[in-house]
A protein has these predicted regions:
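RNase H-like nuclease fold core
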Residues: 1-41, 51-55, 133, 137-143, ...
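RNase H catalytic domain
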Residues: 4-8, 47-130
Length: 149
């Protein structure tokens, strides 16, 4: 999965890509936005992955690879502390992208789970490269499925 905005803030998008054991694309999804931030798109990608994979693979916790330290920290390290403190950060400010974070939290409370794992972006990792191409609009879902599906 990946999210992007260019310029930041500016036009952006996010994408989620699922590969099979042979590195063929089983599933991909992209959404584009006229005005957004990079961090918002990374969080939206995580939210989409939680909904999609949490519903589809409810008998185990799927691993989702993410190149955003911000998204991983927000959803795995900071979110629960902010929630305990009334959705206020330690600096007494409201977290950016709070509505997305709260939606993620609500869906997790319903039992949906994913494990977010950090990967390096732009290092030739096929799933991440395809998600980046989709998030930035360089490729469409149809092009990815035709070429890599």
């Amino acid at each position: 999965m990946d999210g992007s905005a260019h310029p930041n803030p500016g036009k952006g998008g996010f994408a989620v890509v699922e590969l099979d054991d042979d590195n063929r694309v089983k599933f991909c999804h992209q959404e584009q936005f006229e005005y957004t931030t990079n961090n918002e798109m990374e969080l939206r990608a995580c939210l989409y992955a939680l909904i999609y994979y949490g519903h589809r693979y409810h008998l185990f916790v799927p691993i989702v690879y993410c190149d955003s330290v911000y998204a991983i920290n927000t959803l795995t390290n900071w979110k629960n502390n902010w929630k305990r403190n009334g959705w206020i950060k330690s600096d007494k400010k409201i977290p950016e992208n709070l509505t997305i974070i709260q939606k993620y939290d609500i869906i997790e409370e319903k039992g949906y789970q994913i494990e977010l794992r950090k990967i390096e972006g732009h290092k030739g990792i096929l799933g991440n490269e395809l998600a980046d191409a989709l998030a930035t609009g360089r490729m469409t879902e149809q092009e990815v499925m035709r070429k890599y599906g």
